[in-house]
């Protein structure tokens, strides 16, 4: 069983982010919902037995442990969907933290022997690359994303140790064109 300390650390980090947004909104004379944002949070540590990964996910986008060698893609949560298309849940919504059962469902822990990449991305990346939430569970789609990143004809990203140019390569890659997808694009990759 995973220690309650991990839940405290990850859950408190998410809650502190929620509180910080509320405090900033108050200081600016704005409403917290003016700062509506998703949150994709993960911590990980390598041990002799493998990797420990814990996460907290509010909103849409994608948070996934991907392993090309074993052809697996493990979502570390479930994207939130609203009542209508294009709607989601946001970190700024107070009920995210008042319903303890729903809160703990947002926390995930995994131990894996190894992985190729830990991906965290907003829907500006996940929507055009995966098209549906069901496709987020398809390892073939994650293979396609990995191949697009690393073998892109126009803007390849060299995801190798000590590649200082990776950040600029990734920024160039994020500028891809996708009809009907004009949302913000943010991606973090641990590889």
Tell where the protein language model's regions lie, with residue ranges.
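Residue-level preference for alpha-helix termini and adjacent loops
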Residues: 34, 38, 89-90, 124
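Conserved, helical-rich catalytic subdomain that frames metal- and/or nucleotide-binding sites
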Residues: 73-119
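Short, surface-exposed, charged loop/turn segments at secondary-structure junctions
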Residues: 58, 69-83, 131-147
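Short, catalytically relevant binding-site loops at active-site mouths
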Residues: 62-64, 81-84, 126-127
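Catalytic core of PPM/PP2C metal-dependent serine/threonine phosphatase domains
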Residues: 1-65, 103-112, 173-175, 179, ...
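Generic "edge-of-domain/loop-turn" microfeature
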Residues: 46-49, 70, 127
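C-terminal catalytic subdomain
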Residues: 100-191
């Amino acid at each position: 069983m995973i220690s309650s300390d991990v839940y405290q650390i990850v859950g408190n980090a998410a809650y502190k982010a929620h509180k910080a947004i509320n405090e900033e909104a108050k200081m600016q004379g704005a409403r917290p919902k003016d700062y509506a944002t998703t949150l994709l949070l993960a911590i990980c540590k390598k041990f002799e037995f493998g990797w420990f990964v814990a996460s907290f996910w509010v909103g849409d986008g994608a948070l996934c442990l991907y392993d090309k060698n074993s052809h697996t893609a493990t979502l570390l949560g479930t994207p939130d969907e609203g009542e209508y298309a294009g709607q989601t849940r946001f970190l700024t919504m107070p009920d995210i933290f008042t319903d303890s059962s729903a809160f703990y469902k947002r926390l995930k822990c995994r131990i894996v022997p190894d992985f190729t990449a830990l991906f965290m991305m907003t829907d500006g990346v996940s929507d055009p690359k995966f098209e549906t939430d069901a496709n987020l569970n398809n390892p073939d789609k994650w293979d396609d994303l990995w191949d697009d990143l690393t073998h892109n004809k126009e803007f390849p990203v060299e995801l190798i140790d000590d590649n200082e140019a990776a950040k600029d390569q990734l920024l160039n890659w994020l500028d891809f064109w996708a009809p009907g997808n004009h949302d913000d694009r943010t991606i973090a990759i641990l590889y």
